[in-house]
Amino acid sequence: MIKKIKNIINKIINFFSTIYILCKIYLYYNIKNRYEAYNILSVYGDDDFFNKPCPEDSSNWKDKLTFKWVERIIFVGFFRAPLNLNDISDLPSSLKVENTAPLLKDIIFNDSTIPLIKHIYSKFLPRNYIATGLFVFVSVFSFITPLILKNFLSYVEKIDEQKHIYIGIIQCFLLFLSSFINMASQQYSYWFGFKTSLEVKGALETIIFEKMTKLSNLSKKNYNIGSMLNLMSVDTDFFQYFFCHYYIEIFLFPIQILSLLGFLIYVIGIAGFVGFLVMLITIPLSSFLGTQISKNLSTSMGYADTRISLTGELINGIKFLKQYAWEKMFCERIEEQRKLQLKYLYIRIIYWVLVQIVTQASSGLVLVSTFTTYTLLGYEVSLEIAFTSITILQNLRRPIESLPDCLHKFISLIASAKRIETFLQSSELQNQPFIHNQSGLNDILIRNINFNWNEHNLKLKNNKNNQNNNQNKRSIILSSGEQFEITNDFTFDGIDIQDDNYDYEKEYKINYNNNEEEENFMTDCLLKIKPLIKDRRLQQQQADYQDLLSINLPPPPSENVDFKAPKGLLTIISGGVRSGKTSLASGLLGEICKAVDKSSPDSVNSILSTIQQPFLQSTSFRENILFGKPMNMERYIKVIEACCLAPDLLAMGEGKDLTEIGERGINLSNGLKHRIQLARALYADSDCYILDEILSSVDPEIANYIFQHCIKGMMKGKTVILVTHQIQFISSADHVVVVDNGVLIQGTYLELLRMGIDFEMILKEKENRIEKQIVQLQEDEDYYEEVEILDFTMNNNNNNNNNNNNNNSNFNGNNKLKRSSISLPKGISIESIISKDFDQTTIEKAKLFVQEDRNKGDPGWIIYKKYIRMGSSISFFIFTCIIYLTSQIILLLSDYWLQSWASHDRLNVSEPTDVHYLLIYLAYIGGFVFTLGVRYLLIAKITFGSAETLHRSLLKSIIRAPLTFFEQNPVGRILNRFGKDISDIDILLLDCFSDVLYCGACLVTSIGIIIYISPYIAIPFVILIAINYIFQLFYNYSVLELKRIQSISRSPVYSLLSEVYNGLTTIRSFGQQERFFNMMKDNININLRVFFYNFAVSRWIGIRVEFLSAIVVLMSALFSIFNDNPGLSALGVTTALGITFNLNWFMRQFGELESRINSVERVQSYISIPKEKETNEDEFIQTGFIWPSRGEIEFKNVEIRYRPNSIATLRNFSMKINAQERIGIIGRSGSGKSTIGMSLFRMIECSSGSILIDGDDISQIDLKRLRSSIGIVPQDPFIFSGSIRLNLDPFDQFTDNEIWEALSKVKLKKMVSTMPMKLESLVQGGDGLTIGNKQLLCLCRAILRNSKIVLFDEATNSIDFQTTRLIKQTIEENFKDCTILTIAHNIDTILDSDKIAIIDEGELIEFDTPLNLIKDSTSRFSKLIKLNNNQKNKLN
């Protein structure tokens, strides 16, 4: 017996080898010659099919039945691989999201209470009645094959004299037809079900994105980018998978099971009822296990949300993590969430194994219980009874095995539906910005308006205000700061404000110019602020800056706001830290909730804004300015000039204004980011502009230029609301609003001076500080001569007036200076640095982002080998395959034993009894169940281990990637690996691998038994296998490329989602929601298009394989007619019918496996990306325990390029910094200042030259040691989600007392101590903290780190003067023994440095003490001080 089986296996191997060789010869010679002869490629491959309609729409019924309409893609994929997107025709119009999304919009717009799943069924089921009819037809037709088989087996059992050969042949063809029609119908039902699933998926993704663009700020806080990505990927994929496979079957499976069991009872009698009872027991058990699977999966998805959110935060803050050397900390946080996720995924796998055991064993248990009962009742098991029952059970196999999976998928679907429903019911932002209307004729006037970040609190406040309407008490609050209550008990300068005869307006000489409306408005404002206005000069002298910085989290609401911005004039909003400036601007934009108390505002018809955190798209410089507007070259050039962008364009090289900008402007300086967003607003030509801190991030020269040429120039005649803490510009404003501790005080500049707000004193204090620093420098140098210093003081108005005309000129006399900060070199026009047309050469030079990697060709065994080795070993996998094969052999032997039982001669007393046969049969079933459990545990171990290893390796690879990797790859693309790809690896690969091994084992054993029964059937088998192999070759070349394109086509969806999420405020203020919505619809349609053709190609081969399988059934039946052993004949035909199902399922799941293994391929490609340069063990400099001990820094001929072929950012840069020196580094935006800091941290490696710290070349220092030894306060403070403690001391290196002491030094102790959980209080990405607070927290980190070298990278640009003074005071007190590098563009920030370094175009043009530079009238530094003097006095 064993020898015969070995011979059969050898024959099968020889057959496959022969087939493979013959097919290769045939395909690569005959077919390719034919291809060349008929020029197939000229027919299919030369044209661009991207915009051509779907060929299915114009195909005839025969092409639709055979899926011939998709052959063009198959042939092009085989003959001219790889495929690209232009080879793929359009999506059918019925599947486009423009036609499907409106079906679900009721859920958003009408506050539908209908559950999402029910709503989808009601909308999409009637559209796809063909799919419903096909599913019903397949269920009904599943009874036909067992009936035909029953008659065929009755024919086989007859003696030869009673047989009529033509009857047998007719029944053979009936088996062929019933098998083919049944399985072909399933293919068509899959196809139409798949179309439904695409409609649902596209519609859901569209409405989720549309809803996201409408989210209020509170809702946005509840849904971070990780949650949004999960909604758009994992949750919508659950819907797609369910509606593709189960949305009709969930109703039909129970009916099908009951009907087939009823048919089994009809065939076998009352014994079938016992089998029915066994089935009833297994179904609830499977359902319970399925529920547990879904429960654990849902829990794991919650941890996956957190993991992806943390990963997104890691990618967004990768620069800061590397500078702080905190990668390990963040990796541990992500790994912690990953472990929790894997814990529940592991529990899910245990339940999954139990489900597989129950469902796979149930058919055998039903058969055992049925035959046992049948035997005990005294009946004989005949061939007709036995194999008809087996066929019924084979038909029962899919509904029985699929029903539990279907139920637990439905439970998972409910969980996803609830997540989506909750999101869709989230509160939305009010429809329009606060100051929109159609007239635009009047001032912006707001009276008695309540603002709040929280809608619920706003309603409570409104109700409370209504209840207390008659009380003489008012509350005025703006976002943060204390709540000031105005009562009748206050007095103002000794005057009782209840005195109606007190003429406040006369006292402060306020003139309303006979404007009754303005008089009423100002009177109301003055009544509110009377009790709060003090002598501001006294306040400035006695101010406690610690109190100014104290805040409570979350920020309190804003109530009873009165605000005015005159039409066509400049309004400046100013105030201290957390005074409410940005909240007021957000309220005007409609970004926070509002309720009108008494009156509505007059409005303008268009409004644009710039925000403190600039939003830049990952597209070209030009597109970021145009922002969807058509190109107007004349205006475009004016905008470039007004925003001082021409020198930056020149520095971009050959790419000019088509140069790509990294996501979030990662490759740009902070000042350039702000100027680009200012240019965007200016180009759009609005009626009203709200500009939030745009002048703080640029140097004084550029700030003055922008103020004069942009704000007072091109924006002249527009309503401009400028939010700034730079009070030197206030005197130029037409209307001033001071926000002080939640109170709005407003009027003209002179009116506010009369009220006691002394701007001049604050400005003079700042100017005097510069003057005192200069005088101190003189004293330190014992230099008392009269020098030109007096010309630089802020009181010398004569020189100021003479120099006002020189603000925009080059600094003559300094031959080191390359060019002015604001103008182009002579001979270069602005037109020459703007690309005239989109020529391919310029575009290629302008590219920053790299095209997403896409492997080509068949990944073959290599990718599977890598995947398996990550979870176990190749030998372990081979052992698993053997167990799969063994279990199927045992099952097949049980069927063989059953035919022996049915065929034995019961009249012969020497033959074994029925009990003997029954016991052996039970032993076979027991062995099958045991090996079943073992095989599933083994494959689960491999896939689970691989998933764990892949994520860990991916995370380590990303964290070690150089900064250029993140500049060249959008966040969405990277998160796609951590989201969709890892999710597929975690969940779907287990099912796919298991099903492929199971079906493969079934096919091998089935083919083996058929050849064993009828050896001559091997001859036609060779032909059929050869034809099948040819189909497979054509299929594989195309489907692999389609799957890769499909994976890549998802990245733009996620990238755009991430981009829009981060830029919602800007997008909404520009009214660009529709444009981005259309972009997302295009991206979704492209992804669905590739998905559509991918599935169509699978159906093309599926229908052909089904036909070949039906021929196998026909041949097996024909050979059985002439077989002398009826039992073996019955076994052969039954096995052939099983091949039909198994081959169909194998093709389906193998295609699914190939698709999912692409996720492994994509993750693997990121694991192998280049890493940051590691120091070799031999080259590593073994530093002492304390390093650096002195803090000496030396740059030696350093040259740095961000990319190999780019312009050098630093050139021939040499500079030596002694220990404990304070170095001030200044230069225009983009001059290379920040690159110096980046090079110190080895964020960018030197192209040439070297950097030494304490005499050690930092390129030979371990990266972690280097970065952890240098302190930094960055220009864009980044606060990670987590506690205050985590943001200050992530490695628990310091005690609570040390942390509190550091907080006290930066004057944040009071703020943190008032938080509910003190150091453990959560700050989600810095929400509720001002820029100043964030900078102080970063300063606190530097104090705790106690490094010998500290870098301050433009750390005070975006904060007010008081906070800047606090930071400088803290630096002086806590970093006395440190080497300090201060990068800045404000002179007063670095004037007290020991030396000043001036950088221009990447070169060091001046480096000396401040005094020496000041004494040199030709130096750049002395001219900068003069310029600073001129600008401020001109404004005054």
Curated annotation (Swiss-Prot):
Bilayer disposition of the protein: Multi-pass membrane protein
CDD domains, A to Z: ABC_6TM_ABCC_D1, ABC_6TM_ABCC_D2, ABCC_MRP_domain1, ABCC_MRP_domain2
Any one of the GO CC terms: membrane
Location of this chain's protein in the cell: Membrane
Sorted UniProt keywords: ATP-binding, Membrane, Nucleotide-binding, Repeat, Transmembrane, Transmembrane helix, Transport
Molecular functions (GO terms): ABC-type transporter activity; ATP binding; ATP hydrolysis activity; ATPase-coupled transmembrane transporter activity
Keyword Metal-binding attributed: no
Domain ABC transmembrane type-1, chain residue ranges per copy: 128-412, 865-1155
Boundaries of every ABC transporter domain copy: 543-766, 1193-1426
Residues bound to ATP: 575-582, 1227-1234
Superkingdom of origin: Eukaryota
Listed GO biological process terms: sorocarp development; transmembrane transport
Classification via Pfam families: ABC_membrane, ABC_tran
Spans traversing the lipid bilayer: 8-28, 129-149, 165-185, 238-258, 261-281, 349-369, 373-393, 873-893, 919-939, 985-1005, 1017-1039, 1101-1121, 1127-1147
Entry's family note: Belongs to the ABC transporter superfamily. ABCC family. Conjugate transporter (TC 3.A.1.208) subfamily.
Annotated protein name in UniProt: ABC transporter C family member 15
Species this protein is from: Dictyostelium discoideum (Social amoeba)
